[in-house]
Structure formats: structure tokens, C-alpha cells
């Protein structure tokens, strides 16, 4: 008990001053603290908090800086599972290079349909991966690339966008408007519309289907040759096309020529008479088209023409869709596939803006148009096979330009044109691309 007049001593526990605990057992104070004694005031100090004591107990250690940790070694991925090229990481479930990642993504997003012109067992490696798109896609799937991952990735991007249809401003920039006008002009100069033509008909084999009407074939092959030349003229007017290597220009024309020919003739379909009209005005019904050389393609082409009717495409849209068909980086044997894709991007954007400005209440019209490219490719693959069988049916030889431009469509083996060095003379592969032949050839009309 403290004497009278003496200061009241600090609180004690079992005869020891409390503060001594902070020095004898600092490691225990994080969980233990002495109980407060009721009625005894605390003078001159307060019990240190566990955080303060912890700081005191470790302050000496913090004075000495720890050595910096070494940077982690660069991550090394296994070679691309598809082509064995250097991998850039794991994409869609497997280790893959940028090329195979992009090829797989485009193939799934665009629902591409490929055809193998060999035995569906092509070797896919760094050198051969662009030669057969069918086998390359199959290899992507075999090694474990996931279609669902592509779709999920696309859906995620869509969700991240805040209602794009509400906030997108479909205003044509001056550059985009200039591009649309340029493509429209190129299309109109190489393909007159139906309303500009004076129709005429023929009675040749109009009643029943036959294997081949030679007179109709002669006329049809003449018009088709002119149409191919006009397609080349159209291509040369597209932004950036002539900046590609000559080899790539020829590869793209061979791959897309039949797509463009079918798209064009189908825009001249008259459903009331079930007829199609060529650029000289010749109008053939379904039976005559069959007998002129279309054969088993006839019903496919007429069905496609019927599918185009609800789209009500004008010259700008037909020209842009033709240009998109042509400038497609997925074509096999391209030397500069990435450059082709870069040329295609502004065409896609121009078509999207133009279509949605023209039809503001039909937001699905643009994707519907793009889906027609898949239909065209499917018909064209059968069309290239039809050119081969025609050679056995016609009495004479196949017109050289038709054979060169259509038979070799997307890799049918009639000469390895796609592998020709880019420095080779243009005329050595395609007369229509040769400047000399372009100057000497008379003005033509396309079918």
C-alpha cells in the first residue's frame, strides 16, 4: 500500500511492473496482454501496442536491405502444335504460332469451308502450311484447338462493347466515302447493270436439258472469256491491289474469279421469267443455262440468285462484296497474306457502314451479305471441278483463259502458278495481267 503523499505506483502483476513484458517476451505480445487492474490509474506511460512492439522488434532487420531478386527467366513455349514454327503462347488451348492462331480464328469466325484437292492427308509444317487450308484446319482441330474458345473470345469482346448498335456512329469519313465511290465506279465500268441492257433471247435447246448444246457453249465461252478480262480490270482498280506482288495478284484472281463471276451473273437474275442476262443482252432460261455448260451447277447458281433477291444489293454493295471476295488473306500460296488482310479491312468497314446507313432498321443485313461469301466459295469449288469435266464434253479445246483462270481455282493442280517467283513476267502466268496483252486487246463486254 503506498504511503500518504507518495505518488501512486504503476500497476503491477504478481509483483513485476507490466512494461518489463515488452522487453522479455516481445514475440508473445501479439496474442497476450496483461489484464487491466480496476481502480488503479495509469500514470506516465501506456502499454505499448502489439503493432508498435512488433515494429521495434524488427526495426534492426529492416536496416539491412535484402538483395534484389533476379528477374524470372523468359517463358519458353513448345513449338506450334500445328506447323512446328516458333510459338507465341497458348492460343485456343494449345501452343501455337501467330500464323496458325490467326488462321484458326478466321476460319471459325467466318465459318470457312475449305476443300482438299489431294487425299486429305497433306503434311502441314512451316513450309507447307499455306498450301492446303482444309488439312491445316483439320490439323488445328486434331491437336486440340477449341472452336468454343474462339466463339467465347468473340462473345466476350461483344459484351465488353457498350451496346455498339446504339453508340456506333455510321458516318462516312471522306476516305471511306472516296473508297466506296472508287469501288462502285470500278464495278459499273466493268459490269453494266440489267436496266442498261437490251435483252434478246434464243430458242436453242430451251425446252429440255441435254448434256451440252454446242452453239450455246460457243456463245457462253466467248462471253465468259470477256467477263474474266473485265474481272481483272476491276481488280486492278481496287485500292492497293497493284501494290501486291504479281504472284499474289495472280493467286487472288485465280482463287476468286469464279466467285465474282457467279455473284455478278446472279445480280442479273429475273425471277418472274427465271432467266439470267449476259452483258451483250443474251438472256437464257434455266434449261438453256444448263445446256450452255453450267450442267450440275445450274440449280445451285439459280438458288443462290434467289437468295440474293431479299438483300436488294446496289452497285456499291456488289462491288464491295466482290472486292472482299478477291482480297482475302486466307487464300493458299500467298506470299503476303497479312498485307492482303490489311487491304481487306477498310473494305469490310466501308461495306458495314454503307449497308447500315442504307438500311438503318435492318442491322443483320451486313452479316447476311458476308455469309454469301461462304456460299460462293462452296459453289466455286464445284465450278472448278465442272471446268475439268467440260473439257471432256466440248468438241474442241477449252478457251485458254477459262482453263487458266478457273480450272486452277484454289489449288486444283493444272500448273503450280502460286509458287512462281514474284519477279517473273506477268504474261508468263496470266495473259490478262500482262500490260502488253491489256493494251493490245480490244474493248470487251463482260457477261
Swiss-Prot record:
Region: Hinge; residue ranges are 146-174
Compositional bias ranges of the Low complexity kind: 414-447
Region (Modulating) residue ranges read 1-79
> Which parts of the sequence are annotated with region: Disordered?
47-72, 407-447
**Domain NR LBD residue range list:** 175-409
DNA binding happens at which residues? 80-145
Q: Which UniProt keywords apply?
A: DNA-binding, Metal-binding, Nucleus, Receptor, Transcription, Transcription regulation, Zinc, Zinc-finger
User: Which top-level group of life is the source organism from?
Assistant: Eukaryota
Record-linked Gene3D superfamilies? Erythroid Transcription Factor GATA-1, subunit A, Retinoid X Receptor
Q: Which PANTHER family match?
A: NUCLEAR HORMONE RECEPTOR (PTHR24085), RETINOIC ACID RECEPTOR ALPHA (PTHR24085:SF8)
Q: What does this protein do?
A: Receptor for retinoic acid. Retinoic acid receptors bind as heterodimers to their target response elements in response to their ligands, all-trans or 9-cis retinoic acid, and regulate gene expression in various biological processes. The rar/rxr heterodimers bind to the retinoic acid response elements (RARE) composed of tandem 5'-AGGTCA-3' sites known as DR1-DR5.
Its family?
Answer: Belongs to the nuclear hormone receptor family. NR1 subfamily.
Q: Can you name this protein?
A: Retinoic acid receptor alpha
**What species is this protein from?**
Takifugu rubripes
